[in-house]
């Protein structure tokens, strides 16, 4: 990625640097019966919220079914993207051997060392991404979901890995600070959240190509 150091930021289609896929519904219905208890979690759309995994309401998969779901196994650094229903929610997988992909959630698995999953997660939450990719796509059609081929066409601004890491470090600190205020006054929490969103969008807004 020498051009990153010459021009600062390069624009790349997601499908050129990541595997984007989903699990067909029949792959689950054929092999899996959900359970309300267990160890292996099937991550559904409702578990992907505000950049994080929300594990308040989960369904489990029996370990005896796992050998039939090799395409569904998730790894650290995998990013989930909701493409139907509440479109555009993202989260990163933070553990191995615990999570499997359920239907109606897209898996984005980055295949290049110059693109950091943590940077991707923050960028997918930014106003720049929503204004240039999601909103434009939804406004141009009556689709209630985003097909995989459209997701693969998402255009990403990719700065150097050093810049990506700096952005992630700053936003991680803001995120931690906001979480520390969850028991504070509502007005204070709202103000801090707006401040976080402002700096996130400033850091993740690049000159259009």
Annotate each PLM feature.
Residues 44, 69-72, 76-126:
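A short beta-sheet element
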Residues 99-106, 139-160:
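A short glycine-rich beta-alpha junction/loop motif
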Residues 35, 98-101, 175, 185-201:
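Short amphipathic alpha-helical linker/capping segments at the junctions of internal repeats
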Residues 9, 14, 40, 74, ...:
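Short, structured motif recognition centered on aromatic/hydrophobic residues
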Residues 17-31, 46-76:
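Sequence-specific dsDNA recognition surfaces
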Residues 1, 8-10, 120, 152-193:
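Amphipathic alpha-helical segments
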Residues 3-25, 188, 194, 199:
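Non-catalytic DNA-recognition/assembly elements of restriction-modification systems
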